[in-house]
Amino acid sequence: MLQCRPAQEFSFGPRALKDALVSTDAALQQLYVSAFSPAERLFLAEAYNPQRTLFCTLLIRTGFDWLLSRPEAPEDFQTFHASLQHRKPRLARKHIYLQPIDLSEEPVGSSLLHQLCSCTEAFFLGLRVKCLPSVAAASIRCSSRPSRDSDRLQLHTDGILSFLKNNKPGDALCVLGLTLSDLYPHEAWSFTFSKFLPGHEVGVCSFARFSGEFPKSGPSAPDLALVEAAADGPEAPLQDRGWALCFSALGMVQCCKVTCHELCHLLGLGNCRWLRCLMQGALSLDEALRRPLDLCPICLRKLQHVLGFRLIERYQRLYTWTQAVVGTWPSQEAGEPSVWEDTPPASADSGMCCESDSEPGTSVSEPLTPDAGSHTFASGPEEGLSYLAASEAPLPPGGPAEAIKEHERWLAMCIQALQREVAEEDLVQVDRAVDALDRWEMFTGQLPATRQDPPSSRDSVGLRKVLGDKFSSLRRKLSARKLARAESAPRPWDGEES
């Protein structure tokens, strides 16, 4: 049984966090100064300010956390900026397309899509979000299988990604498929929340694990043909064939999280290892639920560089959206299952793993790589981590509504900080204090080089002599023992002959 231990902080230190945000390159430092006002720079300085109050240090709760299980070099702004050089023409497009898959126009589906569009337009301020008409999974002709942990039907991600790539609108910056069906990327994996196709700006994410209650009766095995090939008769969305959906306000926020996380990947942002951030990867549902709804300052600078928004305007839009969610979305009733209660933690007999996107596939014909924010369960330890029991995420005090109101209060604090009158001297004081600190050791994502000492003939000869004498002594002792045993052993045939 796993022992419960307090979470431990994970940090690269203030100096490294400052370099990750501002950069060590003189041109990028000048770009930072010109892109942000003094108030914005002091706000972003929360990334490396040891006295920060708005952004939190990463916590490690188990030895199986994503941070420890997927070691790799963290992506700072300079690395991100260099990766954008070949993406400039595509960034001129201003439309994000959401492609519902088997999401009918019933109240639950339409309300969810409306909230997703509103959240996405606030999160990616400056881009227009268009929701395409829902398509049936049967028309996509993607592979499918029965779920291993329920009677639901799972859709294979590769067929969906191929469909999205081939039907991508000409003015699309990116296209994201949305489905309430469970997804799986490989036969050996139990499920995944999301996956994207690098180089083509298409991805897909599933909300099946975030619904207030899992489907009580999903399509059975004979229904597989409805998805693997187009049916002769009228096509019915999956919800109409047994899906019982109930999204609480908190469950809807989880859907927004995975949607914005995946769209950030499609805009070029990598996974985050700096502070608590939406762009953290996750190897368990518990880690996915613990991710915040917004970006850390380092990832926020990346997104601002791509879209060019003012920070306060973005936070004001997000604040307005959060107020609307609290006021209009159905609250969790007493006794009603929630995403926190209905979704069990991973049991000890499920191996959990997640592939890194450090080696992405570049075409549909090549092996596709789930992003490091996708959450996959392997049926065998050879797919990644062996066995893991994830702790259940605790329900925030006051229930799901209080958790959303807490985020609303955090957004209000961000707006207040950005409205403050800030002098350059305030920034200089923070920078001077951080620059005076010692630099911490920083993991580079590469194994340390093997140490090679200069050759020394004297040391080599002496070592060989010592080892040779030692082995000769052991050989003599073993020979003496064998001889003594042979002489003292009884020989029954001598008695028989006499």
Curated annotation (Swiss-Prot):
PROSITE patterns per the UniProt record, alphabetical: ZINC_PROTEASE
Assigned keywords, A-Z: Hydrolase, Metal-binding, Metalloprotease, Protease, Zinc
Any GO BP annotation: proteolysis
GO MF term (any one): metal ion binding
Disordered as annotated region, ranges: 332-381
Enzyme class label: hydrolase
EC number: 3.4.-.-
Keyword hit for Metal-binding: yes
Binding site for Zn(2+) 1: H261, H265
Classification via InterPro entries: Archaemetzincin, MetalloPept_cat_dom_sf, Pept_M54_archaemetzincn
CDD domains: Peptidase_M54 (cd11375)
Cofactor: Zn(2+)
Binding site for Zn(2+) 2: C272, C277, C296, C299
Active site, renumbered: E262 (proton acceptor)
Entry note: cofactor: Binds 2 Zn(2+) ions per subunit. One is catalytic, whereas the other seems to have a structural role.
Family that this chain belongs to: Belongs to the peptidase M54 family.
Function text: Probable zinc metalloprotease.
Protein's recorded name: Archaemetzincin-1
Naturally occurring in which organism (per UniProt): Homo sapiens
Gene that this polypeptide is encoded by: AMZ1
